[in-house]
């Protein structure tokens, strides 16, 4: 498998003129040519544009600097995030020919920082899935073991970094869609506090949970990308008005840090997984305490009710009238039915149907409103926990990467892949997945840390120090 150095190494190399932006793009091109046919991580690749941009930067002697910290560095973008003039398919037949007329705020900020957008990555259709098997463009294979999934829904973004097709990538995370693929591919996946990163230009799945996230090789790289894309945005009223704190990354573990593992997240966990997550802390001399958060056990059920309901509303816009696929029939209703019937995949239809049912008269109180009450109670339980500790520890996923096709026809089993990443998402908390130094059958295991709301900088700083000690 090919690879590329992390941003934290490429940036000083560019500054010292040990390589050029074109050299980096050429390495990426070779990696894509060597791996992409087997892995299927990209939906579109912009190699010619990237080469042109790299040459322009080199000719002008523009290297990473305070105004353009990512000058010459290739970044991949999940294909549910808008890049002006390029396709934004959401891996769905209904948007297969859609061209975005504008840049998402995060893309605009990356471009302003000098980044080269190398391509758009594969995903589960409309980001609905945990294995990248619902994409109309085919499954993404895990570069570490091509018989295994890369995770989902941001499987393409994770796989691209794992084989060296970009230096960093953006994914999206509604209930684990960036953290779980990062765990499966041995990478870092950081989900910021809800509202820290603008969602403008992200195609909506469940608006109250969706977040754009960096997927990188190191915590330092994730912190750099986050520092560029985070901050208030007048186009997204859910963003915090304050500029996020600057991360001070240190290799020294802060003294007196209190970490608790969530009891309910380890009760039914495989013993090998448990050891791979706990042992690194024992090795570094960090004492863990046990903390019970009983409500996390119901998080998947509440997450599904709420996200399916929001999806049924958000995806109502795909009707074949204004944009996207249109299957013309004699009558308007027939056109709607034919367009959505042919344009949307099985899993997306399932979620829309269940979500619509949960919002229907006579059932909304029993399902949707009950889930909202649960969400509020869960958030309070997390707040109470953080009055006692600084960080909470849990697995990122219940297993290492599973085989392609293993869960595809078992929706419940697939949904439970997100059992450890939905509760902190529902509570709008920042969380990060970092790879354990211990593997299981040569496959990586993700360690997840969660911090109080808006403590993103503190979480990144601690995760960076922990990563260095691992």
Which residues does each PLM region occupy?
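Enzymes and membrane/adaptor proteins characterized by extended Gly/Ser/Thr/Asp/Glu-rich
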Residues: 69-106
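Glycine-rich, small-residue loops and helix-cap segments
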Residues: 72, 112, 288, 307-310, ...
